From Swiss-Prot:
Domain spans labelled PTS EIIA type-1: 551-655
Localization terms from the record: Cell membrane
Organism: Staphylococcus aureus (strain NCTC 8325 / PS 47)
Entry annotated with the keyword Ribosomal protein: no
UniProt-recorded name of the protein: PTS system glucose-specific EIICBA component
Protein EC: 2.7.1.199
Length: 681
């Protein structure tokens, strides 16, 4: 139960990042527009006092401000999409649910425009609807409910006479019903919840603000490895605390108050739960990266310089710290704990210095410049001496502990032991043993990319052993293990099943052939690494980076590098001259090898293995030679969209030695059959 809850919290935390991602763009418009209207910038740049420039500045301020004014709705849409695997139907359902809930609450409580005029009432006008103000929490609740409706009903079957409403079309219908029902308990209990939140936040800030900001920074940093920090900071940024703007509206949340004060040019009082990250992200962590570089072995310093240099620059400019933090988190947990303590102390230090800095994305230089230096509303320059002190502390603490405790930070690792080897015949036995043996297997399954095993006791699974056997990654979700063996996953599963049933695995790829093939493949790989391979688009549609595919195996490139296409037509065509290497039994995936030796996997949709071949028509067979543009597979696009998690189609280079992909038309935009997709080297 606890593991399941933890997994759900991780998903919610990740989903919150989608609506948060729009805030930097809104903040950029608002910050520049506000700065152009301020006396400070006009003093240095008199030409911006021109009437036309000021009109543009006001438009920019309004365009940025409207995003912050409608954050609850944006959170509803974003959380719904995030928890539903990226499907837009969930967003439509969330919008339907959001307006129905607010309209029903307003009518039930008899809220009128006159009621809204009283700030103490807790009422507000949302999208023109007089209703109860539930804030960002209300949006998150609706988003989660819409995602639940989607995941529950997206593939529902109805009688033939109601067939039009089956599948994904049923989701907004259910959402309309559930949000109408939800409105009544929300109308009755939310005022009490809101009063409790206000009392808690007021007491927290009034009792001992210094302790509060220290604990906030410390706990938020400790939660990063678990992906729960987005859940933790959301109430502080969007709900806790209150401030009345010039129009008499009550604004809640440290970040929202800060942005509103910047927009109005008011005296700054917010930023306590954001500003502590500037010294750490701009100075402390880059200094830690320098310490890691200086303690690396001489023969590894060139590689570490590239790794740490890019991570440090990312932290300084944008405030994205995970690439740097995860480089030492697991090998040196004490360093991460000290890092969390220093983060909390940074919040406390800036609070004691009476600074008021905020951001829309993170504590990097970009936000520091736009929302600190340009508005010039607080003593922003004090961050620099504090940051320099932090740089010295981080550098010497990290360097001393890395050397003293012999931490294996990047560049200090021992030479890797030789990976375990197993022939094709031995591999299923070895994988079964690594999974804890037959008695530990509760359920065995596979798809085109991974071996899916539900085990009785996760502690018996040898994760490093699975990686030594060729798994490019191992995912753990409760007692469910997913070992990424690529296209051979289904074969391994089939042979493991035979072993468990007491059958003999007969010559899956004969021993002699396997040895010969290994030599040939090794030679091919060394040769192909020097070649250039042109891959043309096998589908027509919209190009999407792998990082945006809502499946961890593809987004984290466990199968290999590549790109994805969201198809607009139900055809897959050969992307080059070559041969069909493998077709998955359920027809949803095909493996190809080009005449130049490039191995490519085309995986139509996500979780389409569950369709058992329905909606797919093959036009080729394994071993068949194909020419570029030959029709490989037809698929029913509407059926996949209605019955699968997503129609997005990853296109993966499965050779680990080919890592340089040049996307000729970029990783976004539309593409058609035959257009050059990328060049692989």
């Amino acid at each position: 139960m606890r593991k399941k809850l933890f997994g759900q919290l991780q998903r919610i935390g990740k989903a919150l990042m989608l609506p948060v991602a729009i805030l930097p763009a809104a903040g950029l418009l608002l910050a520049i527009g506000t700065a152009m209207q301020g006396e400070s910038l006009q003093h240095y740049l008199p030409f911006i006092q021109n009437g036309g420039v000021q009109t543009v500045a006001k438009l920019m301020t309004g365009a940025g401000g409207i995003i912050f004014d409608n954050l609850p709705m944006i959170f509803a849409l974003g959380v719904a999409i995030g928890l539903a695997g990226g499907d837009g139907v969930a967003a439509i359902a969330a919008f339907v649910g959001y307006i129905i809930m607010n309209k029903t609450m307003g009518d039930f409580l008899q809220v009128t425009p006159k009621n809204i005029g009283d700030p103490a009432s807790g009422y507000a006008s949302i999208l023109g609807i007089p209703t109860l103000q539930t804030g960002v929490f209300g949006g998150i609740i609706i988003g989660a409910l819409a995602a639940w409706c989607y995941n529950k009903f997206y593939n529902i079957n109805l009688p033939s006479y109601l067939g039009f409403f089956a599948g994904k079309r049923f989701v907004p219908i259910m959402m309309a019903t559930t949000s109408f029902i939800l409105a009544f308990p929300m109308a009755l209990i939310w005022p009490t919840i809101q009063s409790g939140l206000n009392a808690f936040s007021t007491g927290l800030l009034d009792s001992n603000t210094g302790v509060a900001v220290f604990l906030f920074g410390f706990i938020k940093r400790l939660l990063i490895p678990f992906g729960l920090h987005h859940i933790f900071h959301a109430p502080f940024w969007f709900e806790f605390g209150s401030w009345k703007n010039a129009a008499g509206e009550i604004i809640h949340g440290d970040q929202r108050i800060f942005i509103e004060q910047i927009r109005e040019g008011a005296h700054l009082t917010a930023g306590k739960f954001m500003q502590g990250e500037f010294p750490v992200m701009m100075f402390g962590l880059p200094a830690a990266a320098l310490a890691i570089y200086h303690t690396a072995k001489p023969e590894n310093k060139k590689v570490v310089a590239g790794l740490m240099g890019s991570a440090a620059l990312t932290s300084f400019l944008t405030g994205i710290t995970e690439p740097l933090e995860f480089s030492f988190l697991f090998v040196a947990p004490l360093l991460f704990f000290i890092h969390a303590v220093l983060d909390g102390l940074s919040f406390l230090t800036l609070y004691l210095l009476d600074l008021h800095l905020g951001y829309t994305f993170s504590g990097g230089f970009i936000d520091y410049f736009l929302l600190g230096i340009l508005p010039n509303k607080t003593q922003w320059w004090l961050v620099i001496p504090v940051g320099l002190v932090y740089a010295v502390i981080y550098y010497f603490v990290f360097r001393f502990l890395i050397v003293k405790l012999k931490y294996k930070t990047p560049g200090r690792e021992d030479k890797q032991s030789q990976a375990a080897t197993a022939s094709a015949t031995e591999l299923p036995y070895a994988v079964l043993e690594a999974m804890g043996g037959k008695a530990n297997i509760k359920h065995l399954d596979a798809c085109i990319t991974r071996l899916r095993v539900e085990v009785n006791d996760k502690s018996k699974v040898d994760v490093p052993g699975l990686k030594d056997l060729g798994a490019s990654g191992v995912l753990e979700v409760g007692n469910n293990m997913q070992a990424i063996f690529g296209p051979k996953s289904d074969q391994i599963k089939h042979e493991m099943q035979q072993i468990m049933n007491g059958q003999v695995v007969e010559n899956p790829t004969t021993m002699e052939d396997d040895k010969d093939e290994t030599v040939v493949v090794a030679e091919d790989k060394s040769a192909t690494s020097e070649l250039s391979h042109i891959v043309h688009a096998p589908l027509t549609g919209e190009v999407t980076p792998l990082s945006e595919v809502p499946d961890q195996v593809f987004s984290e490139k466990m199968m290999g590098d590549g790109i994805a296409i969201k198809p607009s037509q139900g055809e897959v065509r050969a992307p080059f001259n070559g041969k069909v290497q493998m077709i998955f039994p359920t027809k949803h995936a095909i493996g190809l090898v080009s005449d130049s030796g490039l191995e490519l996997l085309i995986h139509i949709g996500l979780d389409t293995v569950k369709l058992n071949g329905e909606g797919f028509t093959l036009h080729v067979e394994e071993g068949q030679e194909v020419k570029q543009g030959d029709l490989l597979i037809n698929f029913d696009l509407d059926y996949i969209r209605n019955h699968a998690k997503s129609d997005i189609t990853p296109i993966i280079v499965t050779q680990g030695n080919i890592t340089n992909l040049d996307f000729k038309q970029g990783e976004h935009g539309n593409i058609s059959f035959g257009d050059q997709l990328f060049e692989a080297k």
